[in-house]
């Protein structure tokens, strides 16, 4: 699951972010946004384009960032995620992870409003092309 690899990468490379592979602690999560702590990053996969014969897939990933009542907190994290992932090529995000061919941001951080507690939320979306070998794809 590429979202897990992106979440682990964010936890390692982005200021004030930490990822726990068990999903219990830290503030970076896969497809869930707990009520606390205030500052959270949720990483989710959604749709993508698959080549029927070539061994590559384009996977869409969203990083949704919730900050505090100060909009700059969440924005700064979302912007750092954007800055660090945009344009990344020919690498793996984690050891023994998927081979990333390229990362293309779909947008700069977008303000999606506040949650019920007045905490600002931001999203940034990426299209990530990965090497994806299957039985009929080589």
Annotate each language-model stretch with its function.
Residues 16, 86-136:
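Acidic-leaning, charged glycine-interspersed low-complexity segments
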Residues 1-52, 88-96, 136-138:
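Small/polar-rich, solvent-exposed N-terminal microdomains that initiate assembly or binding
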Residues 2, 73, 118:
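Conserved acidic
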Residues 69-93:
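Mid-chain, well-packed structural core segment of small domains
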Residues 34-35, 53, 113-118:
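Short, ordered beta-strand-loop transition motifs
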Residues 58-62, 79-80, 138:
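Short intrinsically disordered coil segments
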Residues 55-72, 120-130:
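Oligomerization/assembly interface segments of phage tail-like spikes and tubes
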Residues 51, 71-73, 132-136:
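Residue-level signal for secondary-structure boundary sites
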């Amino acid at each position: 699951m590429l979202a897990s690899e992106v979440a682990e990468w964010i936890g390692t490379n982005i200021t004030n972010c930490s990822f726990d592979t068990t999903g219990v602690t830290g503030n970076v999560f896969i497809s869930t946004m707990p009520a606390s702590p205030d500052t959270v990053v949720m990483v989710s996969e959604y749709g993508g384009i698959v080549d029927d014969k070539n061994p590559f897939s384009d996977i869409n990933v969203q990083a949704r960032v919730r900050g505090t009542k100060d909009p700059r907190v969440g924005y700064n994290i979302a912007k750092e995620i954007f800055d660090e992932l945009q344009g990344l090529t020919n690498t793996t995000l984690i050891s023994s992870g998927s081979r990333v061919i390229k990362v293309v941001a779909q947008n700069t951080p977008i303000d999606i409003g506040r949650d019920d507690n007045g905490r600002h939320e931001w999203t940034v979306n990426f299209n990530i092309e990965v090497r994806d070998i299957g039985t009929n794809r080589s």
